[in-house]
Amino acid sequence: MFKTLYARIAIYSITVILFSALISFVLTNVYYHYNLKASNDAKIMKTLKEARQYEQSAKPTHIQQYFKHLGQMNYQIMTVDQKGHKTFYGEPFREDTLSQNAINNVLNNKDYHGIKDKPFALFVTGFFDNVTDNTVGINFKTKDGSIAVFMRPDIGETFSEFRTFLAVLLMLLLFISISLVIASTYSIIRPVKKLKLATERLIDGDFETPIKQTRKDEIGTLQYHFNKMRESLGQVDQMRQHFVQNVSHEIKTPLTHIHHLLSELQQTSDKTLRQQYINDIYTITTQLSGLTTELLLLSELDNHQHLLFDDKIQVDQLIKDIIRHEQFAADEKSLIILADLESINFLGNQRLLHQALSNLLINAIKYTDVGGAIDIALQHSHNNIIFTISNDGSPISPQAEARLFERFYKVSKHDNSNGLGLAITKSIIELHHGTIQFTQSNEYVTTFTITLPNNSH
């Protein structure tokens, strides 16, 4: 229905103003009906009886002139004689609605309280209802006999100037209110329009241009969070570009090497060299296969909504299986693996946890000096599960330590890994609501510590 927020707020505000005016009118009408109507009736009845008392004491020659004089004093009067003849004085009534029964009762000396007894009407205020049944009436004794006199104040005449003033006041009130509503709506919508333009810039890839935070209300909070979102999206875009560059480099280098080996393979007839080239190509393709596998795993971890973490895992047995699987690689370097494992159960994703712990052991074997030792420990600590793996090897600089868990980061340029192992491990541990930390002692003993919640209860 509304194509703009500006129109929606303006229409809603104007509707509220008009609806409030209507409700106020109805409530005022109710207040008059239940609180003022009876006292108003009594005041007018008192005035009419005082007029009768004066007429009886003063004995004016022409009773009609007397009523005419009352009419000129802003009263509306209707007289009815015993023959049913009606005479009106003052401003005319809008409608003659008085019943014959009411007239007969007054002629029989019974007072008429039409103002007090006026039925309630929701949208008609009895105070202003200019009809003959909305009057008070009493019997007047004249030389020509009894007459019924009905009277009410001429509200229109009495309040004509005030009514004009009130009408002007209401018109100005509505005009100023609506003008202020439109102006205030524009002040609300203007920053929203700026946000819209800023989102369009984001769609076009502009993550550098901030929007000025001009307010401290909800709009200002929205502006603040928009700027934070813009910064985050800019960082994500930089990471994406960096990721694409790294993947391109990791794939391009081995493909170039394979291309070179295939050229050499075509040009040589030496069986020994040909076999060496084939072995090298096989090694490189194996590395490429590992890279694609890890890239797919990273993508799975980034879009983890479908992953389940309800496997009942015997963690100590899982570590033993990993050690047994990597024992051959450790034996090739004459490494000793010492494991102190408590029997611990954990609820999580066994495939992913196996991958994370395997990465740490493979790294430890890779970077431990020949003849060295690797220490593995698993234990309870309060409400947590603590896993540590330590090994002695070459020291790592503080700069390298700070970037250790970045994707594609390699401590050494001569490292033949793809730099994804620790990044994958960190993502897996965090998906299990755990943490991983790296520490290094003065004796160049490096330690990875994984802390997981004890959720097996």
UniProtKB/Swiss-Prot annotation:
Function field: Member of the two-component regulatory system HssS/HssR involved in intracellular heme homeostasis and tempering of staphylococcal virulence. HssS functions as a heme sensor histidine kinase which is autophosphorylated at a histidine residue and transfers its phosphate group to an aspartate residue of HssR. HssR/HssS activates the expression of hrtAB, an efflux pump, in response to extracellular heme, hemin, hemoglobin or blood.
InterPro entries cross-referenced by the UniProt entry: Bact_Sensor_His_Kinase, HAMP_dom, HATPase_C_sf, His_kinase_dom, HisK_dim/P_dom, HisK_dim/P_sf, Sig_transdc_His_kin-like_C
Bilayer disposition of the protein: Multi-pass membrane protein
Catalytic activity: ATP + protein L-histidine = ADP + protein N-phospho-L-histidine
Name of this chain's protein: Heme sensor protein HssS
Subcellular localization: Cell membrane
Keyword check for Lipid metabolism: no
All copies of domain Histidine kinase, residue ranges: 246-456
Keyword Lyase carried by entry: no
Residue positions where Phosphohistidine is found in the record: 249
One Pfam family matching this protein: HisKA
EC number: 2.7.13.3
Organism: Staphylococcus aureus (strain JH9)
Positions of the HAMP domain: 186-238
Transmembrane segments: 9-29, 164-184
PANTHER family xref list: HISTIDINE KINASE, SENSOR HISTIDINE KINASE CPXA
Keywords: ATP-binding, Cell membrane, Kinase, Membrane, Nucleotide-binding, Phosphoprotein, Transferase, Transmembrane, Transmembrane helix, Two-component regulatory system, Virulence
Phylogenetic classification of the source organism: Bacteria, Bacillati, Bacillota, Bacilli, Bacillales
Alphabetized GO MF terms: ATP binding; phosphorelay sensor kinase activity
GO CC entries: plasma membrane
Annotated PROSITE patterns: HAMP, HIS_KIN
Post-translational modification: Autophosphorylated.
Coiled-coil residue windows: none
CDD domains: HAMP, HisKA
